[in-house]
């Protein structure tokens, strides 16, 4: 290639689009922080003993067009067939109004978890709708705002049953007609928490001495059975019963709640979310009100704001890992908010009648199929069903299955049987094609007429739903596309996302989610593949996954990867299981002590508790580093039982610890393993790596470092990388291995496979040099912000050369003592300036942790710094008595349009100062839609379902 062609190449175009500051601005920033060059800054920041000796070996960067062309080649290797496998995954139509306005809309997918409710009312409303939808359809009393998948929801239900129940048994019963992938995930959870799992026939449940039970309704083979009597008898034995159910089936079938179930779980996938080779999808959990404080996951509740107006918020957060740590109900952090929102909107758009029509059509097609097969001489395994039938095919099973494959049709193979699951996409032509496979000559139209005479004959009369559902106006209003489009936009406009400005959340890495990275996720070649389709039909996924694993191994210095975990917390869980299985394989299963620094993420101790580890906290010194003397003492005390240490690097204090290699060596010398939490991997890529540092296992947050969007609280992915000695202990899957020996942590082998293309695309378009440069720019941005704010705010931790890593912690505690203004007041006031708050009170109470990422440009960094400096000046006015502590722009923040237009203004500052505090806000303004939300009121008056329409009107 000539020099001119090289200079005109688009090969590295994406790097400049991903990184915020252009080269000239980087130079200005370096001068401002007194650094000679970017590389000099890195040398001052990252300890020399952990710097990589050689660049990463990765392919050269691709242009956006070249990346998409390569991605299309992966996609073409996948074969989209007509799939009737079922087993919890179904074809579905994603309404285009939802596809375009939600899934493909950065206003929805780039938002963060709604910890700041004043700027999150849109998605909070949608998630509340999700909860109401689940409550109504399952017949339960309270629901959460999504879990990772149906299988992990079942595992969470098991632990809920133990916490909430009164039985002294240590055995959990699982009916043998539960989805196989669910059974395996439950077995994994049970083994490491010390429970025994008993798999048996449903009929045997009442006679078992068990603390909890899991049953499937309809069953995995499609059978519909009345569970009322079995549930009552089990409960008489102090057994809490969980029913795994299907939301679409619940529109026609008597729901689990009306049969007396204690817990209902399942997947909302078929409500408009593509199968995606296994995910991501929103699972759900609903239970009785009395169990609400033992229920895992985020719960949206109704509260009021400072003016007494209705406002939504995340309720009962004291149950969660970021507060209760090892005593939390679960380690779940990231859930599936974006997918829950899609399912919620699907229900809003179709409404009760629309959903019932879809269910009737699906059931009618199934009834036609069943009638035709019966007339054709085939015997059904059961005559009651909703959308799934199982045919006794005996010796013909393999021949019929092969014939189906030849006709591009996927069926489910069972011993001596074939399963067929229909869905909303099933057509008359599909039924005719299925008849052809089985040699049935019946006419579909004639069968339809015959079946219509008793439309619900396959549903026992006692199991036909009579109760109403989705009666709230939100499910009965937005049924035209115009109405729906406007409703989606109204909710979107209430929320702050990356489309509005920087989200400087420390330890969250809210970087760019580029449009080019997002495009492939809606391609049918990725979306329409069933996770249990024959492997040859998913060759594209296999090739993509193999290449991504190789890239991640190179980036991390590990030898093997599993893509199965659906979140960072799930990755931690899989990693600790790998460590414990490794110890067991060496006859050292007694090693159960996990050392965790006091600065650790809340998920770390919560996860360690989930694998029955004893958590021992290691102190940090005044500089934010692990206290080496305390570590040595704790290792010595527990050396015989030491399993592992969980560290984060750079530490959650925002510094590169100089002695991290020494920490690893000390733990290894005592027979322990090192788990390096990958939450801060964005400050390692290309400069160092977990494997080089000396770690044995890490999870990576693909929704942080590798650009999968946060989605307002999920999806996420937490694949784990390991050194070779731990590779045999990565999670397996029932589809690939020996039943009972898989230690699966997710329902599908590749977890949330359909979003893997995002991370692959990011790595491909950045290349080695681009990835390394992104890390350097992230460090530059953080140090620039730190240096601009340091004259005004105390910075809590810095490295030995006065530098920070990719984030910095601002200490508000002395300022609060001086002025009376808290970190929460600053966080809320930042909303008036057009910003999402930094991370509050983590890892140190009374602080703000700022992470700008590499994607923010100099103008945005300056806008943020100017806002923070202006807020500091406002704090000084409070201190000096110009404004009273109980009435000033900070404690009254955020300000709304209603405040601006109110007739009375009883405040000692102007409306302009309150609502337009900076020059930037006068040219463009994001408006919070509620005043400060009352958290205490919300938890004391807990309402987790849609409020009356009158409340909206008020």
Curated annotation (Swiss-Prot):
One of its GO terms (cellular component) is cytosol. GO terms for molecular function: glycine binding; glycine dehydrogenase (decarboxylating) activity; pyridoxal phosphate binding. GO terms for biological process: glycine decarboxylation via glycine cleavage system. Gene3D superfamilies: Aspartate Aminotransferase, domain 1, Type I PLP-dependent aspartate aminotransferase-like (Major domain). It catalyses: N(6)-[(R)-lipoyl]-L-lysyl-[glycine-cleavage complex H protein] + glycine + H(+) = N(6)-[(R)-S(8)-aminomethyldihydrolipoyl]-L-lysyl-[glycine-cleavage complex H protein] + CO2. Keywords: Oxidoreductase, Pyridoxal phosphate. Its EC number is 1.4.4.2. Disulfide bonds: none annotated. The glycine cleavage system is composed of four proteins: P, T, L and H. This is Glycine dehydrogenase (decarboxylating). It comes from Vibrio parahaemolyticus serotype O3:K6 (strain RIMD 2210633).
